[in-house]
Amino acid sequence: MLHLIRTEWRLLLFGFLMTFFSAPGQTFFISLLSGEIRQATHLSDGEFAAVYSFATLCSAVVMIWSGALIDKINLQKLSIALVFGLAVGCGILSISTGIVSLVLGVFLLRQFGQGLMYLTSATAMVRYLEHNRGKSTALAGMGYAVSEAIMPSILVALLLWVGWRNSWQVTAVFLIAIMVPAILYLLRGHRQRHDLYLTQLSEVDSQSLGNPLKRQWTRPEVIRDKFFYLFIPALTSQPLMFTGFIFHQVHLVETKGWSLSVWASLFIMYALVSVGTKMVSGFLVDRYGAIPMVPWLSLPMGVGLVLLPVTLTIFWEVVFFRSLFHISDPTSRP
């Protein structure tokens, strides 16, 4: 692990920052401002959830094509474009007054933040650090956990200080000011790494024509494979339930009479579970492979759902339900 960090710290830090600053497009970030957004746009909980779901679904459909850009565009240029796209989404949401601008703003946040920035980070780790893909993906993915630990408290403080609209604008400015120079520095000389990857890829494909586990699959091949459809329910149920819970967290806090500021401060406990899960799963993936872990992915989340109705205090809700939920959460695994 230490050798990996010493030799590949630039690429690992790039992946970490991409996941960390994907926060404005993540549900935990947007939902903390949902009360103010609903009030400004005169939407109920259900109506805002419908808008959010529609924008997220549109983003998922577009990802079928936009996700392929990672294979076609220079990583440095693409990453900078994603940062600006996310910043534009923050700007549009900050001035939204109706359904159209709200949908557009949320769509851009979900597409560039939750979708492409996170996907770019994970793809870079797996693609260029193949022999340490588990540990590298875990280290880069820790950006999400750290973001979850500190962003809610910062966002709540920013909300109380400058209001929700200015909070989005401040987020956009900081996003560009920090990420653009960081990407230019951390991916300096990346072209040589990518050329080496292409050379190795062509050699592997030529040697593994009869081995479906090693060669690169095309999209039509994946769609025709029956095991893909058996895997989809387990894979999609986790983000579906997790996003639904996080999206309505403000409503849950209000319903149970808890303090939003205390709730936000307890995200750090949640993040610690995420970090631990990432590190353990990273080692397991590198040692045993990802396939043996698949049958166990949804079990902790199922236990957490059983315990949710009996969590009476904010502390035990975080300790039991959210910790178990996050073990199954796809963002906590390589």
Regions found by a protein language model. Give the residues of each.
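C-terminal ends and interior cores of transmembrane alpha-helices
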Residues: 84-97, 300-313
